[in-house]
Protein backbone atom coordinates (compact mmCIF):
# COMPACT_ATOMS: atom_id res chain seq x y z
CA UNK A 1 0.00 0.00 0.00
CA UNK A 2 2.92 2.36 0.72
CA UNK A 3 4.22 1.96 -2.83
CA UNK A 4 0.80 2.54 -4.39
CA UNK A 5 0.05 5.68 -2.36
CA UNK A 6 3.56 7.07 -2.69
CA UNK A 7 3.96 6.57 -6.43
CA UNK A 8 0.43 7.76 -7.16
CA UNK A 9 0.78 10.97 -5.16
CA UNK A 10 4.22 11.73 -6.58
CA UNK A 11 3.44 10.97 -10.21
CA UNK A 12 0.03 12.63 -10.34
CA UNK A 13 1.36 15.79 -8.70
CA UNK A 14 4.10 16.02 -11.29
CA UNK A 15 1.70 15.47 -14.20
CA UNK A 16 0.22 18.99 -13.98
CA UNK A 17 3.44 20.82 -13.21
CA UNK A 18 5.47 22.29 -16.02
CA UNK A 19 8.69 23.81 -14.71
CA UNK A 20 11.47 22.22 -12.74
CA UNK A 21 14.02 24.40 -11.02
CA UNK A 22 14.27 23.90 -7.27
CA UNK A 23 10.83 25.43 -6.66
CA UNK A 24 9.01 22.96 -8.91
CA UNK A 25 10.83 19.85 -7.74
CA UNK A 26 10.53 20.74 -4.08
CA UNK A 27 6.87 21.71 -4.31
CA UNK A 28 5.82 18.46 -6.00
CA UNK A 29 7.73 16.20 -3.62
CA UNK A 30 6.62 18.03 -0.47
CA UNK A 31 2.99 17.92 -1.56
CA UNK A 32 3.28 14.23 -2.44
CA UNK A 33 4.61 13.59 1.06
CA UNK A 34 1.58 15.29 2.61
CA UNK A 35 -0.71 12.77 0.89
CA UNK A 36 0.95 9.76 2.50
CA UNK A 37 -0.78 7.84 5.27
CA UNK A 38 1.04 7.28 8.60
CA UNK A 39 2.45 3.87 7.65
CA UNK A 40 3.78 5.24 4.36
CA UNK A 41 5.36 8.19 6.17
CA UNK A 42 7.01 5.77 8.58
CA UNK A 43 8.50 3.83 5.65
CA UNK A 44 9.64 6.95 3.80
CA UNK A 45 11.09 9.03 6.64
CA UNK A 46 14.31 7.03 7.16
CA UNK A 47 15.10 7.38 3.44
CA UNK A 48 14.83 11.18 3.49
CA UNK A 49 16.23 11.86 6.97
CA UNK A 50 19.58 13.02 5.58
CA UNK A 51 17.89 15.90 3.75
CA UNK A 52 15.27 16.85 6.33
CA UNK A 53 12.35 16.69 3.90
CA UNK A 54 11.30 14.87 0.76
CA UNK A 55 11.30 18.16 -1.13
CA UNK A 56 14.97 18.72 -0.33
CA UNK A 57 15.79 15.10 -1.18
CA UNK A 58 14.27 15.60 -4.63
CA UNK A 59 16.87 18.30 -5.38
CA UNK A 60 19.81 15.98 -4.74
CA UNK A 61 19.94 14.52 -8.27
CA UNK A 62 20.83 17.96 -9.64
CA UNK A 63 23.37 18.66 -6.92
CA UNK A 64 25.49 15.62 -7.77
CA UNK A 65 25.69 16.06 -11.55
CA UNK A 66 29.06 17.80 -11.30
CA UNK A 67 30.60 15.05 -9.19
CA UNK A 68 28.83 12.10 -10.81
CA UNK A 69 28.96 13.02 -14.46
CA UNK A 70 27.65 9.60 -15.50
CA UNK A 71 24.22 10.61 -14.17
CA UNK A 72 23.85 13.73 -16.31
CA UNK A 73 22.23 11.91 -19.22
CA UNK A 74 19.71 10.30 -16.85
CA UNK A 75 17.68 13.52 -16.69
CA UNK A 76 16.50 13.67 -20.31
CA UNK A 77 16.06 11.94 -23.64
CA UNK A 78 17.07 13.91 -26.74
CA UNK A 79 15.94 12.74 -30.17
CA UNK A 80 16.56 14.21 -33.60
CA UNK A 81 13.89 16.35 -35.22
CA UNK A 82 12.77 13.47 -37.45
CA UNK A 83 11.99 11.17 -34.50
CA UNK A 84 8.58 11.67 -32.94
CA UNK A 85 8.43 8.72 -30.55
CA UNK A 86 10.25 8.16 -27.28
CA UNK A 87 10.90 4.79 -25.68
CA UNK A 88 13.63 3.13 -23.66
CA UNK A 89 15.22 1.31 -26.62
CA UNK A 90 16.39 4.64 -28.01
CA UNK A 91 18.45 5.46 -24.94
CA UNK A 92 22.19 5.80 -25.56
CA UNK A 93 24.62 3.54 -23.73
CA UNK A 94 25.10 6.10 -20.98
CA UNK A 95 21.36 6.08 -20.30
CA UNK A 96 18.38 8.42 -20.54
CA UNK A 97 15.51 9.43 -18.29
CA UNK A 98 13.19 6.57 -19.28
CA UNK A 99 15.67 3.74 -18.68
CA UNK A 100 17.08 5.43 -15.57
CA UNK A 101 13.59 5.97 -14.14
CA UNK A 102 12.77 2.27 -14.48
CA UNK A 103 16.16 1.27 -13.10
CA UNK A 104 15.78 3.38 -9.97
CA UNK A 105 12.19 2.20 -9.45
CA UNK A 106 13.37 -1.40 -9.56
CA UNK A 107 16.12 -0.66 -7.05
CA UNK A 108 13.62 0.98 -4.74
CA UNK A 109 11.18 -1.94 -4.96
CA UNK A 110 13.83 -4.65 -4.49
CA UNK A 111 13.69 -5.97 -0.92
CA UNK A 112 17.33 -7.06 -1.15
CA UNK A 113 18.66 -3.60 -2.02
CA UNK A 114 20.92 -1.95 0.56
CA UNK A 115 19.59 1.00 2.54
CA UNK A 116 22.00 3.48 0.95
CA UNK A 117 20.99 2.43 -2.56
CA UNK A 118 17.31 2.69 -1.65
CA UNK A 119 17.94 6.23 -0.41
CA UNK A 120 19.51 7.29 -3.68
CA UNK A 121 16.87 5.48 -5.73
CA UNK A 122 14.09 7.37 -3.94
CA UNK A 123 15.84 10.70 -4.43
CA UNK A 124 16.31 9.96 -8.13
CA UNK A 125 12.70 8.83 -8.61
CA UNK A 126 11.36 11.95 -6.93
CA UNK A 127 13.50 14.13 -9.17
CA UNK A 128 12.84 12.23 -12.39
CA UNK A 129 9.07 12.48 -11.83
CA UNK A 130 9.52 16.20 -12.34
CA UNK A 131 12.04 16.12 -15.15
CA UNK A 132 10.06 13.70 -17.30
CA UNK A 133 7.15 16.17 -17.42
CA UNK A 134 9.36 19.05 -18.61
CA UNK A 135 9.08 19.12 -22.43
CA UNK A 136 12.67 20.27 -23.00
CA UNK A 137 13.85 17.09 -21.25
CA UNK A 138 12.48 15.27 -24.31
CA UNK A 139 13.86 17.69 -26.85
CA UNK A 140 16.49 17.76 -29.58
CA UNK A 141 20.26 17.14 -29.41
CA UNK A 142 20.80 19.83 -32.05
CA UNK A 143 19.81 22.62 -29.66
CA UNK A 144 20.76 20.81 -26.43
CA UNK A 145 17.17 20.39 -25.31
CA UNK A 146 16.25 24.01 -25.95
CA UNK A 147 19.40 25.53 -24.45
CA UNK A 148 20.34 26.94 -27.86
CA UNK A 149 16.81 28.09 -28.68
CA UNK A 150 17.00 31.74 -27.63
CA UNK A 151 14.05 34.06 -26.99
CA UNK A 152 12.87 36.93 -24.81
CA UNK A 153 10.59 36.61 -21.79
CA UNK A 154 9.14 38.99 -19.21
CA UNK A 155 10.22 42.59 -19.82
CA UNK A 156 12.27 41.55 -22.83
CA UNK A 157 14.89 39.63 -20.86
CA UNK A 158 17.05 37.24 -22.87
CA UNK A 159 16.58 33.56 -22.07
CA UNK A 160 16.33 30.21 -23.80
CA UNK A 161 13.57 27.65 -24.20
CA UNK A 162 15.04 25.25 -21.63
CA UNK A 163 15.36 27.90 -18.92
CA UNK A 164 11.86 29.11 -19.67
CA UNK A 165 10.33 25.68 -19.10
CA UNK A 166 12.78 24.70 -16.36
CA UNK A 167 11.93 27.50 -13.97
CA UNK A 168 11.04 30.91 -15.33
CA UNK A 169 7.41 29.98 -16.01
CA UNK A 170 6.81 28.73 -12.50
CA UNK A 171 8.72 31.63 -10.94
CA UNK A 172 6.56 34.06 -12.90
CA UNK A 173 3.33 32.29 -11.95
CA UNK A 174 4.36 32.17 -8.30
CA UNK A 175 5.15 35.91 -8.37
CA UNK A 176 1.84 36.81 -10.04
CA UNK A 177 -0.55 34.36 -8.35
CA UNK A 178 1.31 33.11 -5.27
CA UNK A 179 2.44 29.62 -4.33
CA UNK A 180 -0.97 28.60 -2.97
CA UNK A 181 -2.49 29.13 -6.42
CA UNK A 182 0.02 26.76 -7.97
CA UNK A 183 -0.57 24.10 -5.34
CA UNK A 184 -4.35 24.38 -5.46
CA UNK A 185 -4.30 24.05 -9.25
CA UNK A 186 -2.45 20.74 -8.99
CA UNK A 187 -3.75 19.14 -5.81
CA UNK A 188 -7.42 19.73 -6.68
CA UNK A 189 -7.09 17.15 -9.47
CA UNK A 190 -5.42 14.41 -7.48
CA UNK A 191 -7.98 12.63 -5.32
CA UNK A 192 -9.65 10.70 -8.14
CA UNK A 193 -6.29 9.15 -9.04
CA UNK A 194 -5.24 7.97 -5.58
CA UNK A 195 -4.97 4.22 -5.14
CA UNK A 196 -4.02 3.60 -8.78
CA UNK A 197 -0.49 2.56 -9.71
CA UNK A 198 0.88 4.97 -12.33
CA UNK A 199 4.49 3.75 -12.39
CA UNK A 200 3.88 1.93 -15.69
CA UNK A 201 3.06 5.22 -17.44
CA UNK A 202 6.63 6.55 -17.58
CA UNK A 203 7.00 6.13 -21.32
CA UNK A 204 3.67 7.81 -22.04
CA UNK A 205 4.72 10.80 -19.92
CA UNK A 206 7.96 11.10 -21.88
CA UNK A 207 5.97 10.90 -25.10
CA UNK A 208 3.64 13.65 -23.92
CA UNK A 209 6.64 15.88 -23.20
CA UNK A 210 8.08 15.03 -26.61
CA UNK A 211 4.81 15.97 -28.32
CA UNK A 212 4.76 19.33 -26.53
CA UNK A 213 8.42 19.96 -27.36
CA UNK A 214 7.76 19.37 -31.04
CA UNK A 215 4.80 21.76 -31.00
CA UNK A 216 6.36 24.55 -28.96
CA UNK A 217 9.99 24.65 -30.06
Predicted segments with their positions:
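Sec-dependent signal peptide recognition
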Residues: 2-8
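N-terminal signal peptide c-region/cleavage motif recognized by signal peptidases
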Residues: 14-16
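N-terminal, motif-rich segments that launch catalysis or mediate targeting to/interaction with membranes
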Residues: 18-128, 135-217
Amino acid sequence: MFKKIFFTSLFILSMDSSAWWDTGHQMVCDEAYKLLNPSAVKALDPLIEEHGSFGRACLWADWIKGERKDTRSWHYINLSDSEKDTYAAKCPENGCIIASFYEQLNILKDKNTSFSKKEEALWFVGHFAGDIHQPMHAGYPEDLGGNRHFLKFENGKNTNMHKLWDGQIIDHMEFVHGKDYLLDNVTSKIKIFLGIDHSHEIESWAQESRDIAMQKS
